[in-house]
Curated annotation (Swiss-Prot):
EC number: 1.14.-.-
Gene3D superfamilies, alphabetized: Cytochrome P450
Gene Ontology MF terms: heme binding; iron ion binding; monooxygenase activity; oxidoreductase activity, acting on paired donors, with incorporation or reduction of molecular oxygen
Name of protein: Cytochrome P450-pinF2, plant-inducible
Length: 407
């Protein structure tokens, strides 16, 4: 067996070179339809495994996924073969490290700060939620995914980004095309063609909005970045807005749909959540149970040992937070939705320098505003046919319909 010397954390070791096993059976379609049985098997049999169809080495245990995301010196966000670059037509802050990443992230941080959310955005969010709920017909069966989850997320995002001129339909379409492109690990040309169309439409709108936001500064992310004392380049401002559109619709939309499904299929838990008014707890459990962003990739900067296997420099590892959130070492019966499980931190918002900047917005809009208002309006809402709810997604996942009866 071949041997080589590998330097890890300034210690030089000598050992046989064992590469991770290869899974050449699992397909992207398998992962899109239902990845959870696959991840459960991987955690037990091969927690470090190279999945040939995705061309990446999967890490499925919580310790490993957090370790990778917390250590950008060894695991870079700059995945050279990521479909995110063609999907967004940019090298976005999601694929940058160090000072470059920090500068672009901080450029819009003020718009997402907890004080700005509480003082400025929360009252707007409440008005939006009430306006959209006013449209719902009591007593009817309604697809909340189509009528509420997506549109409310889009309208809230339009305000905080400063793109209110875009319709809900446009923002939802752009977001879906961006994330379909970013998760296009099969490199299907038609998905990039659709994201190209979305980029062209967004660029046209953004060009029209630059003058408005420069002449009338406001708390939106667009205006905040444009009017900063040392602004980042306009191309990166556009890229930041696109990243926010990509994640800012699907994350709260899919989180809300997942939480509603979990509560409505566990009525005893729902009643206890209502009694305790612990909507924030329900929010966190929903994100743990089905992470809206299921996986993240990192470029390995130096030969590294993980669980006895060499992950070589230049390899791309994929941290599967969807699997980490159900890891038996962290969560008892992690496959089940249980609002009242013992507290353990999930990884749905990431970890380390790339921790999701919109985490507090999502907690506020979904956990603190939408859930209590929705169940106050429709306290006896039911999901009459849970088996009709469909779930999709490998990189990004959630229900794609949610037919409930409003009572």
């Amino acid at each position: 067996m071949e041997e080589r010397r590998v330097s890890i954390s300034s210690i030089t070791w000598r050992f046989p070179m064992l590469f991770a096993p290869v899974d050449d059976v699992t397909t992207i379609d398998d992962l899109t339809l239902d990845p959870y049985p696959i991840y459960r098997r991987m955690r037990v049999q091969n927690p470090v495994v190279h999945v040939a169809s995705v061309r990446r080495t999967f890490l499925t245990k919580a310790f490993d996924t957090k370790m990778v995301k917390d250590d950008p010196s060894r695991f870079s966000s700059d995945d050279p073969s990521t479909p995110m670059k063609p999907a967004f037509q940019a090298h976005t802050l999601m694929r940058k490290d160090g000072t470059e990443h920090a500068r672009e992230r901080m450029a819009m941080a003020r718009a997402f700060a907890p004080k700005a959310i509480a003082d400025h955005w929360a009252p707007i969010y409440r008005d939006i939620v009430n306006e959209y709920l006013d449209r719902l017909p009591r007593g009817d069966t309604v697809d909340l995914f189509a009528e509420i989850c997506g549109p409310v997320a889009a309208r809230i995002l339009a305000h905080i980004l400063g793109i209110c001129e875009a319709s809900d339909v446009e923002i939802i379409r752009w977001s879906q095309r961006l994330i379909d492109g970013a998760g296009n690990f099969g490199w299907r040309s038609e998905l990039f063609e659709r994201s190209d169309e979305a980029n062209a439409e967004m660029n046209c709108l953004f060009n029209d909005l630059v003058k408005k936001h420069r002449s009338a500064p406001n708390p939106s992310a667009f205006a905040t970045m444009l009017n900063a004392p040392d602004p980042i380049p306009l191309s990166q401002i556009y890229a930041n807005i696109k990243i926010a559109i990509g994640g800012g619709v699907n994350e709260p939309r899919d989180a809300l749909g997942t939480i509603l499904y979990g509560l409505l299929t566990n009525p005893e838990q729902l009643e206890e959540v209502k009694r305790q008014q612990c909507w924030g707890q329900a929010f966190e459990e929903g994100l743990r149970w089905v992470a809206p962003i299921q996986a993240s990739s990192r470029l390995v900067r130096e030969d590294t040992e993980i669980r006895g296997f060499i992950v070589p420099k230049g390899d791309i590892v994929m941290t599967i937070q969807a699997s980490a959130n159900r890891d038996e070492d962290v969560f008892e019966d992690g496959e089940s939705f249980n609002v009242f499980r013992p507290k353990s931190a999930h990884q749905s918002f990431g970890s380390g320098p790339h921790h999701c900047p919109g985490a507090q917005i999502s907690r506020q809009t979904v956990g603190a505003i939408m859930l209590p208002i929705l169940f106050d309006r429709f306290p006896d809402m039911i999901l009459p046919h849970p088996e009709l709810v469909q779930w999709r997604g490998f990189g990004f996942r959630g229900p794609i319909n949610l037919p409930v009866t409003l009572r």
